[in-house]
Amino acid sequence: MGRPNVLIIKTNGNLGRRNPNTDAVLGKVMSAPAIEGGMQNGIVYPLASINDAIAIGITAAYDLANTLLAYHHINRFFTRNPNATLYLITAPQSASLADMTNITGVYVPVLLRAMAGKVKYVGVARNPAVGYVPVLAGGADSDVAAAVANAQALYDAEFAQFRYAGFLIEGRSFNGTAAAATDLRTLGCPNVSITWIADPAISGANALYNGYAAVGDTLGLISLAAVSQDAGELTPAFNLQNKGLGLFLTAGLSSNLSVNSYSDADLDMLNDKGYIFPDVTAGIDGFYISDSHTCSAIGNNDYAYIENNRTIEKAIFLARSAILPLVKSRLKADPNTGLLLPQVCKSIEATGNRSLGGMLTDGDISGGIDTYVDPNQNVLSTSQLLIQITFVPVSIGRQITISIGFSNPLKTS
């Protein structure tokens, strides 16, 4: 214990300094009425914390006055990951999910172009006006399916421009029947996911919120996960429930029903159909994202889960950034054959291998980085240089089987 004295404990981490991460730069697009002297529709706003949203007029009082969940979604996002950066653009309240994701529109496309590839993932949510009645199709608001198709078309167009950002769509107004639900695994949209998660404390706060889905919470947890990590990993950081903050004391779906209202068979069916919902695991307290499904088949598909896409997109970005200085550069050829000199090929291969070294260090890939430049390609004639890069990804243990039983040391046969 020592002699009586005044002891000093120097604390750290109290200044709220952020730990920025370029993987955790996300976008949020949602319908919400413009604010006089504050947030305007169609303008991109950078948000480093909920205080930046408050500064442009998006407050809890704004939500209450307009019967919407704009502040709520942003606040939940930063509650899940205070170190993330969120770029926000809003549309008029009349805009649908399909409108916001339209490839010729002025919302998601404008955000992605304005950020020039910095935004890595985008959440899209709808705050319908009072009186809105969804048209149900395939077990949900028909607007959801239309937005999924639009988002995939937009992803493909953006990919061609070297901007890589996947999509999370708000799965509004699930009709509560697993059998009637569309099989999302048949939609052929590997870069789009839908969240059907809902916090019943929010769903039940107003009739207009009955069909909402927790885009803010889900997007925040995706941003918190490493690119190779399932955002439903069963570790405390990814627990939807936070009793201290009153988050997800219970859990439900956008059907306005508790997850406990569904049988195990129903939940298994929804999981097999690619639905993201709050799951309960025996032996672990709280609720976790069921899985990181995309709207695409599992078989013969490398991109059936969100982390598959985030990993390959980061690898593409890093490799391209490393190789870009070679564009229009001089590549020496053998004066006798006209083919690239061996040392030129080896130098390019070393550059490609180094580009993914950080991902190996961070644990986002397993290794096996291999860059290959065919020494027999005729760059003199074609002006085209072909480079192949491969690596071994990390695996996710979705089904773990344990064989366990008694042993008897006296048993001889």
Which ranges hold each PLM region?
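Anaerobic metallocofactor- and corrinoid-dependent redox/one-carbon enzyme cores
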Residues: M1-P33, T250-G274, S383, I387-I389
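Short glycine-rich, low-complexity/disordered patches
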Residues: Y164-G166, R172-F174, T361-D374
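Conserved, well-structured core segments that form the ligand-binding/active-site neighborhood
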Residues: K120-A265
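Small-residue-rich
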Residues: M1-T186
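Compositionally biased, low-complexity/repeat regions
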Residues: L86, A91, L97-A98, S366, ...
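Long, contiguous, structured domain-core segments that constitute the functional module of a protein
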Residues: A225-V344, F391-S413
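Short, hydrophobic/π-rich interface segment
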Residues: P342-S366
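Catalytic cores of large soluble enzymes that bind and process phosphate-bearing ligands
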Residues: N66, G139-A146, E307, N336, ...
